[in-house]
Amino acid sequence: MEGGSFGAGRAGAALDPVSFARRPQTLLRVASWVFSIAVFGPIVNEGYVNADSGPELRCVFNGNAGACRFGVALGLGAFLACSCFLLLDVRFQQISSVRDRRRAVLLDLGFSGLWSFLWFVGFCFLTNQWQRTAPGPGTAQAGDAARAVITFSFFSILSWVALTVKALQRFRLGTDMSLFATEQLGAGAGQTYPGYPVGSGVEGTDTYQSPPFTETLDTSPKGYQVPAY
């Protein structure tokens, strides 16, 4: 298994709940999670008020239903994303593949950057619509909720920008391949390869030599005499 990549511990290592809860990235996700509830919650509960001329409900932000829908979608999306990314952070050390870790970090980086931009757009849009809202009984009743939505939209910009920076830092850490190569070379340098074992029947460097003659061989047969002519 490949470990120690993208700012996480070695793959398969046990997760320390205390150190995980104290991580800046975890604290930022929890803060963003709370801010998202503080945005879409007031809009759902108090974001629609009675119009002065009739019983129909209108969005407190200048009667623009698109502003309320955008705020709810933005906050609800951030709420679900923070929940999913928190679970991903918990399981991140169990991911053994460096490629899968890289994809997870890229997903975090891309989504955090996108939501930072959307929070900025939402903050500007809601602020503009609130400034154009005409005063009235319904507006005065839901004024605190509208101001809370705008305030926590601004806080969400800061928290998501910080999450983007943390994801970028983790992506730049990448995989410490030099450390991985050093460990491999260190393990291979002290390893020796044994030769042929003694008594295995295989000779390494000895060459075959014919045994020396201990006596001169007589090629003529015994008992035979050459006849004389």
UniProtKB/Swiss-Prot annotation:
The chain crosses the membrane at residues 30-50, 70-90, 105-125, 148-168. The modification N-acetylmethionine is found at residue 1. The gene is SYNGR3. It is found in: Cytoplasmic vesicle, Secretory vesicle, Synaptic vesicle membrane; Synapse. The keyword Transmembrane helix applies. It comes from the Eukaryota. Keywords: Acetylation, Cytoplasmic vesicle, Membrane, Synapse, Transmembrane, Transmembrane helix. This is Synaptogyrin-3. GO terms for cellular component: neuromuscular junction; synaptic vesicle; synaptic vesicle membrane. The keyword Ion transport does not apply. Belongs to the synaptogyrin family. May play a role in regulated exocytosis. May indirectly regulate the activity of the plasma membrane dopamine transporter SLC6A3 and thereby regulate dopamine transport back from the synaptic cleft into the presynaptic terminal. GO terms for biological process: positive regulation of transporter activity; regulated exocytosis. Pfam families: MARVEL. Signal peptide: none annotated. Residues 20-172 form the MARVEL domain. It is a multi-pass membrane protein. Interacts (via N-terminus) with SLC6A3 (via N-terminus). May interact with VMAT2.
